[in-house]
Amino acid sequence: MEMASHPAVHPVALPPPYQAVGPPAPPAVRINDFPGSPGTLMGLALRFAQLGFALTALCIMVSIVGFSSVTAFCFLVAAMVLQCIWSLCLGVLDCYALLTKRSLRNSLILSFFVVGDWITSTMTFAGACAAAGITVLIDNDLNQCGPNHCNRFEAAAAMAFMSWVITTISFFLSFWILVTCR
């Protein structure tokens, strides 16, 4: 004798849902509200911090007479200009998203953020390392730090490294959200 299951469904009565008295509970935090993600207040703060450090490094380098005679310093200036433009554009986009209450959690937009952050982060790191290397060469190996503004070079390299750290944080946050978005 063969046993067969029957397709009949037996409904079960459920108790009515619990009705809480008082104000409704706040919505649960979702991944698209993650601090630091594009379109959030923390994401905007990260962009302006990137812009601030990059602009500081750029202003320090430009204020030094004769910085353009060293290729590494010219590369740092070019990288900081690119970082400033990138951070300013994405900061404006974050402001727009915050003001209009729109989400930037689109995989195409997040891919754009990830690739742009990766490129600018790499350029910023390369420029900061090159400037720091030349500064160490001038200071420690050639012992010609007096007439060559080593303190300013060191400050510009330090600001570039800070901009790199914040851009890298932004890159990893955007990449993580892009991966979990799909």
Curated annotation (Swiss-Prot):
Membrane-spanning ranges: 48-68, 73-93, 118-138, 159-179
InterPro entries referenced in this protein's UniProt entry, alphabetically: CASP_dom (IPR006702), CASPL-5 (IPR045009)
Extracellular face residues: 69-72, 139-158
Subunit and partners: Homodimer and heterodimers.
KW Transmembrane (keyword) present: yes
UniProt keyword terms in alphabetical order: Cell membrane, Membrane, Transmembrane, Transmembrane helix
Annotated localization: Cell membrane
One Pfam family of this chain: CASP_dom
Organism for this UniProt entry: Physcomitrium patens (Spreading-leaved earth moss)
First-listed, main subcellular location of the protein, grouped into a coarse class: membrane
Keyword Cell membrane: yes
Cellular-component GO terms for this entry: membrane; plasma membrane
Protein name from the UniProt record: CASP-like protein 5A1
Protein's membrane topology: Multi-pass membrane protein
